[in-house]
């Protein structure tokens, strides 16, 4: 037993438990009490341990580590104040130590009080330490969130919004057109977004029409008239994209006479064409190569004007080979061929190919006006399908405009109105007039029908003018009638005002008299108008006669008018004089009655 404990035991036994003694016991002080050694020997071990237990219950062990000496007597090390020990006394009653954070394996566990602590681990992946067997579930902060069991990234936010078309009784067609609903509209918008971003390749649909030069060689049928190799036939195939099997398997009818391929190369890159057009051009180039061999064998020339052709090039309307008119589109028969005739001499081909003029002439002639004297007239095609009016393409730059013909076997008219036209120059190229392909212009335009149309239109205009005049007259009459009715309505009193039959009779008489007066004045105005009109007509007739006669007649007319004016004046005065005695008679009749 230490000396301090013995001293404290002595002080307790003696009853001197003062504050100074406690301070001396806590912080140390001078030894005032000398303890006899015999007293320590006589004390029982149990008596010494009892105050030790009381001290342990009063002072908590938090922050205090007991170190046992060799003899087994504990040596306390006080590291906290009394206030902290009092506040932690409640926690000591709970046999649970809560540790926040990672606890490494092998860390010293608090095994005091005989129970194992429970570890509340908040971090993911950590193990819950303890031997209690109940696994404590923690909050996983790193896991992705979820709404009603659905991951947060997969939740459709539109489902939380109150859409107007989802309300009961709403008509979906008021919000989505063309048969869309909410889901298909979202899919459509997503597809358009991908197309705009360039993530999706737009396929060439089968509804787009194309006109391709299917056969690159120019052909002439045996029945056509050949003048020193100047008639060349393009074979143009009209159909739809996407049917490469049909187009490649289409047999081409070869004629006896073949010509070099088309004049110009197109600048279309092969990436812009579909696979069907590429396969088509490959077959066309094969045919061109075979026909070139025949052309060289027949004419003995080593090189034709242009035998070079780009591998992916295709002749399409609107590029270099332009056709003046294509009468309609055939959709029923996709493999129908339209044969286009163009004239070209071999010398013109050699001279003109070296430097072709620009693509469009600056003043391309309009197709709806009659042609100038240096252009061939537009052709007539009787066998073309009348589905769509012709689009009207400008003529090609390096050659005279080709013309469509109904049948190749039909004869050609000689000349343009039986006259020869001079060649019209453009740049360095002179286009000669076509002698055989153009029918005469008067045969194409029926002038009598046009004049009939103009005469008919003039008659219709006159008729409409007359109708408008009659309508105006009827309107004026209706206005006068309505005015008269309003006037009568203004003068007419209500039926309750009529007290006697005399008043009603008098009112009717007054109304009739007013109507008669109005009618007389209107007739007078009409007579005056007619007289003025007649005088105008007379003066117009008089102006055509001689001056002396006109003067004489005008004097007679003036005297006649003066005489008439005097006469009318006299008649008016007589009427006024006759109407004045009437009130006097009424007054004289009224006096005897009184």
UniProtKB/Swiss-Prot annotation:
<feature type="modified residue" description="Phosphoserine">
    <location>
        <position position="87"/>
    </location>
</feature>
<feature type="compositionally biased region" description="Basic and acidic residues">
    <location>
        <begin position="501"/>
        <end position="528"/>
    </location>
</feature>
<dbReference type="GO" id="GO:0003723">
    <property type="term" value="F:RNA binding"/>
</dbReference>
<feature type="modified residue" description="Phosphoserine">
    <location>
        <position position="492"/>
    </location>
</feature>
<keyword id="KW-0597">Phosphoprotein</keyword>
<feature type="modified residue" description="Phosphoserine">
    <location>
        <position position="500"/>
    </location>
</feature>
<feature type="modified residue" description="Phosphoserine">
    <location>
        <position position="304"/>
    </location>
</feature>
<dbReference type="InterPro" id="IPR051187">
    <property type="entry name" value="Pre-mRNA_3'-end_processing_reg"/>
</dbReference>
<feature type="modified residue" description="Phosphoserine">
    <location>
        <position position="496"/>
    </location>
</feature>
<feature type="modified residue" description="Phosphotyrosine">
    <location>
        <position position="426"/>
    </location>
</feature>
<dbReference type="InterPro" id="IPR007854">
    <property type="entry name" value="Fip1_dom"/>
</dbReference>
<keyword id="KW-0694">RNA-binding</keyword>
<comment type="similarity">
    <text>Belongs to the FIP1 family.</text>
</comment>
<protein>
    <recommendedName>
        <fullName>Pre-mRNA 3'-end-processing factor FIP1</fullName>
    </recommendedName>
</protein>
<feature type="compositionally biased region" description="Basic residues">
    <location>
        <begin position="542"/>
        <end position="551"/>
    </location>
</feature>
<feature type="region of interest" description="Disordered">
    <location>
        <begin position="358"/>
        <end position="594"/>
    </location>
</feature>
<dbReference type="GO" id="GO:0005847">
    <property type="term" value="C:mRNA cleavage and polyadenylation specificity factor complex"/>
</dbReference>
<feature type="region of interest" description="Sufficient for interaction with PAPOLA">
    <location>
        <begin position="1"/>
        <end position="111"/>
    </location>
</feature>
<feature type="region of interest" description="Disordered">
    <location>
        <begin position="1"/>
        <end position="96"/>
    </location>
</feature>
<feature type="modified residue" description="Phosphoserine">
    <location>
        <position position="85"/>
    </location>
</feature>
<dbReference type="GO" id="GO:0005829">
    <property type="term" value="C:cytosol"/>
</dbReference>
<keyword id="KW-0507">mRNA processing</keyword>
<feature type="modified residue" description="Phosphothreonine">
    <location>
        <position position="494"/>
    </location>
</feature>
<feature type="region of interest" description="Arg/Asp/Glu-rich domain">
    <location>
        <begin position="457"/>
        <end position="490"/>
    </location>
</feature>
<feature type="modified residue" description="Phosphoserine">
    <location>
        <position position="554"/>
    </location>
</feature>
<feature type="compositionally biased region" description="Pro residues">
    <location>
        <begin position="358"/>
        <end position="404"/>
    </location>
</feature>
<feature type="region of interest" description="Sufficient for interaction with CPSF4">
    <location>
        <begin position="137"/>
        <end position="243"/>
    </location>
</feature>
<feature type="compositionally biased region" description="Acidic residues">
    <location>
        <begin position="44"/>
        <end position="55"/>
    </location>
</feature>
<feature type="compositionally biased region" description="Acidic residues">
    <location>
        <begin position="81"/>
        <end position="95"/>
    </location>
</feature>
<dbReference type="Pfam" id="PF05182">
    <property type="entry name" value="Fip1"/>
</dbReference>
<feature type="region of interest" description="Disordered">
    <location>
        <begin position="238"/>
        <end position="306"/>
    </location>
</feature>
<feature type="modified residue" description="Phosphoserine">
    <location>
        <position position="89"/>
    </location>
</feature>
<feature type="region of interest" description="Sufficient for interaction with CPSF1 and CSTF3">
    <location>
        <begin position="443"/>
        <end position="594"/>
    </location>
</feature>
<keyword id="KW-0539">Nucleus</keyword>
<feature type="site" description="Breakpoint for interstitial deletion to form the FIP1L1-PDGFRA fusion protein">
    <location>
        <begin position="339"/>
        <end position="340"/>
    </location>
</feature>
<comment type="subunit">
    <text>Component of the cleavage and polyadenylation specificity factor (CPSF) complex, composed of CPSF1, CPSF2, CPSF3, CPSF4 and FIP1L1. Found in a complex with CPSF1, FIP1L1 and PAPOLA. Interacts with CPSF1, CPSF4, CSTF2 and CSTF3. Interacts with AHCYL1 (when phosphorylated); the interaction is direct and associates AHCYL1 with the CPSF complex and RNA. Interacts with NUDT21/CPSF5; this interaction occurs in a RNA sequence-specific manner.</text>
</comment>
<feature type="compositionally biased region" description="Basic and acidic residues">
    <location>
        <begin position="454"/>
        <end position="492"/>
    </location>
</feature>
<dbReference type="GO" id="GO:0006397">
    <property type="term" value="P:mRNA processing"/>
</dbReference>
<feature type="compositionally biased region" description="Basic and acidic residues">
    <location>
        <begin position="295"/>
        <end position="306"/>
    </location>
</feature>
<feature type="compositionally biased region" description="Basic residues">
    <location>
        <begin position="560"/>
        <end position="570"/>
    </location>
</feature>
<feature type="compositionally biased region" description="Low complexity">
    <location>
        <begin position="274"/>
        <end position="285"/>
    </location>
</feature>
<feature type="compositionally biased region" description="Basic and acidic residues">
    <location>
        <begin position="1"/>
        <end position="10"/>
    </location>
</feature>
């Amino acid at each position: 037993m230490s000396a301090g404990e013995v001293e404290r035991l002595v002080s307790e036994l003696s009853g001197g438990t003062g504050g100074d003694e406690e301070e001396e016991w806590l912080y140390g002080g001078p030894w005032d009490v000398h303890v006899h050694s015999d007293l320590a020997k006589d004390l029982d071990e149990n008596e010494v341990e009892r105050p030790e237990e009381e001290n342990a219950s009063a002072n908590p062990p938090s922050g205090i580590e007991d170190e046992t000496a060799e003899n087994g007597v504990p040596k306390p090390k006080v590291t906290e104040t009394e206030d902290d020990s009092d506040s932690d006394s409640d926690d000591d009653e709970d046999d649970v130590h809560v540790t926040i954070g990672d606890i490494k394996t092998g860390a010293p566990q608090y095994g005091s009080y005989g129970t194992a602590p429970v570890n509340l681990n908040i971090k993911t992946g950590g193990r819950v330490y303890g031997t209690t067997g109940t696994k404590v579930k923690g909050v996983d902060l790193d896991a992705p969130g979820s709404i009603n069991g659905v991951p947060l990234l997969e939740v459709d936010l539109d489902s939380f919004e109150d859409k107007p078309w989802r309300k009961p009784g709403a008509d979906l067609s008021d919000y989505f057109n063309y048969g869309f609903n909410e889901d298909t509209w979202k899919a459509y918008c997503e597809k358009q977004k991908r197309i705009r971003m360039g993530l999706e390749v737009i396929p060439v649909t089968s509804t787009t029409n194309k006109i391709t030069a299917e056969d690159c060689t120019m052909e002439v049928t045996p029945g056509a008239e050949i003048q020193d190799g100047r008639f060349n036939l393009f074979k143009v195939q009209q159909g739809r994209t996407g049917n490469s099997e049909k187009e490649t398997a289409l047999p081409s009818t070869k004629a006896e006479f073949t010509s070099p391929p088309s004049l110009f190369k197109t600048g279309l890159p092969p990436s812009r064409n579909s696979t069907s057009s590429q396969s088509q051009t490959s077959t066309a180039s094969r045919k061109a190569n075979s026909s070139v061999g025949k052309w060289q064998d027949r004419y003995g020339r080593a090189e034709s004007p242009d035998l070079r052709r780009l591998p992916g090039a295709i002749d399409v309307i609107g590029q270099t080979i332009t056709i003046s008119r294509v009468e309609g589109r055939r959709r029923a028969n996709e493999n129908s061929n339209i044969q286009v005739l163009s004239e070209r001499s071999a010398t013109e081909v050699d001279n003109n190919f070296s430097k072709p003029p620009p693509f469009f002439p600056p003043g391309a002639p309009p197709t709806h006006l009659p042609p100038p004297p240096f252009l061939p007239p537009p052709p007539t095609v009787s066998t073309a399908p009348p589905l769509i009016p012709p689009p009207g393409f400008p003529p090609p730059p390096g050659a005279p405009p080709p013309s469509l013909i109904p049948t190749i076997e039909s004869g050609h008219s000689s000349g343009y109105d039986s006259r020869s036209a001079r060649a019209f120059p453009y740049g360095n190229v002179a286009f000669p007039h076509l002698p055989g392909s153009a029918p005469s212009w008067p045969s194409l335009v029926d002038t009598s029908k046009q004049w009939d149309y103009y005469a008919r239109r003039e008659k219709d205009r006159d008729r409409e003018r007359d109708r408008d005049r009659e309508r105006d007259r009827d309107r004026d009459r209706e206005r006068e009638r309505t005015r008269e009715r309003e006037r009568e309505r203004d003068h007419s009193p209500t039926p309750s005002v009529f007290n006697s039959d005399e008043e009603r009779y008098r009112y009717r008489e007054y109304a009739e008299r007013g109507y008669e007066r109005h009618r007389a004045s209107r007739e007078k105005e009409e007579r005056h108008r007619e007289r003025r009109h007649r005088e105008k007509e007379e003066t117009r007739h008089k102006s055509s006669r001689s001056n002396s006669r006109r003067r004489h007649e005008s004097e007679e007319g003036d005297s006649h008018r003066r005489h008439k004016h005097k006469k009318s004046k006299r008649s008016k005065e007589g009427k006024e004089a006759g109407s004045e005695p009437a009130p006097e008679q009424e007054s004289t009749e009224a006096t005897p009655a009184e």
